[in-house]
Amino acid sequence: EDSRIRCLEQENRGVSSARNLGMRHASGRYLCFVDGDDFIDAAFLKHLLDASDRGASDLTVAGKLFCDRFPPDKIPALPTCGIFLRREFPLKNNLEFPEGIHPCEDGLFSHFVLALTEKISFCPEAVYHYRQHEQGNHHQIRKRTADILPMIPRWLSLIEEFYEQRHLWKRKAGHLVRFIEHEPFELRLLDMPFSPPEQEILYSIIRDFLNAHCTAAECRRASLHLPFRLLLKSSGFSDFGRRLRRAGKNTGIRRKLLHFCPVPSWRRNGRAQLRQVREQLEEIRRNITF
């Protein structure tokens, strides 16, 4: 036995309850979360500890995948496997994983952490091995559209409560908009096999929340992805579909105009970017029926 290791037991009340129990009983300087299906490299914790101590950070982003995914100042949320957290930070800010919420309990928790700190470090050397299989959470979640759709307003209600209590609506408006783009829009509306009526309901949920809480200036930010900007400009679900189709045609026209660009490297880069945008738009139109 190792005296540094403690085993805690409780009735199965979900992953949030288990993580919160662990946080309340932890005594070290840092918190790290590893799911039961996964495993970590031998040097995983050492890399994270060194990076966190060097940066005196509240949160360290773990792994190259997550370090590369977002610009340093524009991370809307992270999965628990991408989080290495100074233990005192959630304690002094009264932060816990939201219980009774699944999926997105980790997204909400990390979003709240990121909203409250600028002291973030990055550790691409930390290697986390994530197992994917048919019975895994990710695959099961994609099949449960009827359960997840009514869960999304609960996410937004928790966000409203958090931003209201901490007076963050103005100061962290951009952070909030990027979360809405990432979680309910990209990961749910665009990626999950909702039925057409469910897609229209989710579209309305997203638009109503943004109209209520986010300024037009934040919603026009160029850093937002094109499909999300099209949603923000649309007047309804059908109009969103028309804008997607029009954007796909426009990328084809722009690609032809690049033929007249005199700089070969600009021409190649422009074509690659337009190809990527067009493929993304085509995939969205295949997934969503307007």
Task: Please provide the spans of the model-predicted regions.
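Short, contiguous, well-ordered secondary-structure segments
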Residues: G82-L85, P90-L91, F185, Y203, ...
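Generic structural signal for well-ordered, non-membrane alpha-helices
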Residues: R154-E161, H182, R255, A272, ...
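Membrane-interface aromatic/basic loop that binds lipid-linked glycans or pyrophosphate carriers
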Residues: M192-F290
